[in-house]
């Protein structure tokens, strides 16, 4: 009688260490970013077809440590504030630790090292600016010919959020409505969404030809963009607030400031009409200046023009721009006039057309009195406009009868209304002939006789009757037998042609099985 086989120990399963760092790494999907596993043998081939329950699990924590070890050779290429990466890691001072925690946490550090490994950037060597939501650093890249290219790397803070009012700019954003609720409840997801928002806004501005940093690469909370500054020494362009324009005469200086004011209004209009965006935080601190050109930066909080807060943000931008240029001695337009210029959908969006429109606004406005009382009245009008309720949808117009009695120029929402003349249907005979003549006479004034007005009304009613005559309803059930048969044969023929390009079922099964093995 053969003895019974001795029981064998079950295969060792290496469980990943359940730490907070492991959970964060799995949530951020770091493995998929740095190891694609393309061309590696499948698990079934390596283990001889073992079942899923017997296969050892991957120790993700150990794999990430190995990747950090491989990428550590690039640590010397990151120099922030004249400190090497090793000094930042080893120094235990509270200030250095706070800087490392806010910006260069483990995940952000790994993303930057991976960018260096992929030659997206070659070195980070200095700080351009620091803010409440992100820091911007100097970076260097090299093209295929070995030419040095200056870049800017914007790293959004992830741990200590100095800017906590992001919900106001994200809520109601149609581009992110499917994920904004989850992002608002998780700070790390909100940072990722915030960086993606600015990257997409920069793409819109750059495509529309508005001077701004060129967006190049985005990974989680690290964005690489074009550098706006001197490429020889790495100094960025100055902000508009720090710019000093000095001409040979006082008139030349005032003319240059006025030209910049007109250019900025044109950029705001193009940003609204072409890009469909409102900056939301436009001021002299978010505008760079170099050789007569203005550059728009920091568009992370920009919203679309149909956002629930877009009107308030636009009025705030107009107030900041007018106040700044007024302090520089520019004769600015009123806030109400600038608002109508930006939101008018019928005007031109090219440079020459917008410049002519602004010159026309200056020419047609009422003359300004030099007295203090007149200036005070204009300031009161600006304050009223800044605090006035402007409906964004027609559902918010409550007293319609009162609004219809107002003049067209006093309606703040006039740009949302259609033209007063509704295009009539083609083929109507009332457009030409006696009906058209009587209608035109009725529009000229009160000089026409009552008989002519009545005839015009009769012709108009006849035209409306032709336009609203009864037509056959839609739907297959209202078709006759021949039309139904023709439609049925056309549908069959379309399906027959579609089946010719259909993938065979056995080929589809093989592809599905192959994809499962790769996973």
UniProtKB/Swiss-Prot annotation:
Mg(2+) binds at residues 286, 298. InterPro entries: Kinase-like_dom_sf (IPR011009), RIO-type_Ser/Thr_kinase (IPR051272), RIO_dom (IPR018934), RIO_kinase (IPR000687), RIO_kinase_CS (IPR018935), Ser/Thr_kinase_Rio1 (IPR017407), Tyr_kinase_AS (IPR008266). Its EC number is 2.7.11.1, 3.6.1.-. GO terms for biological process: ribosome biogenesis. Residues 1-54, 418-519 are annotated as: Disordered. Residues 21-36, 439-464 have a biased composition (Acidic residues). GO terms for cellular component: cytoplasm. Residues 440-519 are annotated as: Association with (pre-)40S ribosomal particle. Changing residue 281 to A: Decreases ATPase activity. Gene3D superfamilies: Phosphorylase Kinase, domain 1 (3.30.200.20), Transferase(Phosphotransferase) domain 1 (1.10.510.10). ATP binds at residues 154, 228. Residues 122-519 form the Protein kinase domain. Residues 470-489, 497-519 have a biased composition (Basic residues). Its main location: cytoplasm. The active site is at 281 (proton acceptor), 298 (4-aspartylphosphate intermediate). It is found in: Cytoplasm. It holds the Pfam family RIO1. Keywords: ATP-binding, Cytoplasm, Hydrolase, Kinase, Magnesium, Metal-binding, Nucleotide-binding, Ribosome biogenesis, Serine/threonine-protein kinase, Transferase. Belongs to the protein kinase superfamily. RIO-type Ser/Thr kinase family. This is Serine/threonine-protein kinase RIO1. It comes from Chaetomium thermophilum (strain DSM 1495 / CBS 144.50 / IMI 039719).
């Amino acid at each position: 009688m053969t003895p019974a086989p001795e029981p064998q120990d079950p295969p060792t399963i290496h469980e990943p260490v359940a730490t907070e760092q492991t959970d964060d790494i799995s949530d951020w999907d770091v493995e998929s970013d740095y190891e694609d596993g393309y061309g590696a043998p499948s698990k079934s081939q390596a283990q001889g077809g073992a079942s899923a329950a017997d296969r050892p699990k991957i120790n993700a924590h150990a794999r990430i440590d190995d990747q950090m070890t491989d990428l550590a050779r690039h640590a010397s290429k990151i120099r922030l504030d004249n400190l090497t990466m090793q000094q930042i890691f080893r120094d235990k001072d509270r200030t250095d630790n706070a800087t490392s925690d806010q910006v260069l946490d483990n995940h952000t550090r790994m993303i930057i090292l991976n960018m260096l490994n992929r030659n997206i950037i070659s070195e980070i060597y200095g700080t351009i600016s620091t803010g409440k939501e992100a820091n911007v650093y100097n970076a260097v890249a090299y093209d295929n010919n070995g030419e040095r290219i200056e870049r800017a790397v914007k790293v959004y803070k992830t741990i200590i959020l100095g800017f906590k009012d992001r919900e106001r700019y994200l809520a109601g954003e149609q581009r992110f409505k499917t994920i904004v609720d989850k992002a608002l409840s998780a700070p790390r997801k909100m940072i990722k969404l915030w960086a993606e928002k600015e990257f997409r806004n920069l793409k819109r501005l750059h495509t529309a030809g508005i001077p701004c940093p060129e967006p190049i690469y985005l990974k989680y909370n690290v964005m690489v963009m074009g550098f706006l500054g001197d490429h020889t020494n790495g100094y960025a362009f100055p902000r508009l607030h720090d710019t000093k324009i000095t001409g040979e005469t006082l008139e030349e200086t005032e003319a240059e400031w006025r030209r910049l004011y007109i250019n900025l209004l044109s950029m705001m209009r193009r940003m609204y009409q072409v890009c469909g965006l409102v900056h939301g935080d436009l001021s002299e601190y978010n505008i760079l200046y170099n050789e007569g050109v203005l550059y728009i930066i920091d568009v992370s909080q920009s919203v679309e023009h149909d956002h629930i807060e877009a009107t308030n943000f636009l009025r705030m931008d107009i107030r900041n721009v007018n106040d700044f240029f007024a302090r520089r001695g520019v004769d600015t337009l009123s806030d109400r006039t600038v608002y109508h210029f930006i939101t008018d959908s019928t005007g031109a969006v090219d440079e020459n057309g917008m410049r002519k429109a602004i010159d026309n606004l200056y020419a047609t406005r009422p003359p300004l009195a030099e007295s203090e009382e007149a200036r005070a009245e204009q300031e009161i009008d600006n304050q009223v406009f800044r605090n006035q309720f402007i409906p964004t949808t027609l559902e918010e117009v409550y007293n319609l009868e009162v609004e219809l009695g107002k003049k067209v120029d006093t309606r703040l929402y006039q740009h949302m209304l259609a033209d007063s003349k509704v295009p009539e249907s083609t083929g109507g005979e009332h457009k030409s002939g006696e009906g058209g003549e009587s209608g035109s006479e009725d529009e000229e004034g009160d000089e026409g006789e009552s008989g002519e007005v009545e005839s015009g009304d009769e012709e108009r009613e006849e035209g409306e009757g032709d336009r609203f005559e009864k037509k056959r309803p839609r739907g297959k059930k209202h078709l006759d037998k021949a039309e139904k048969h023709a439609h049925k044969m056309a549908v069959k023929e379309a399906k027959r042609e579609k089946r010719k390009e259909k993938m065979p079922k056995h080929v589809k099964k093989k592809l599905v099985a192959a994809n499962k093995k790769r996973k």
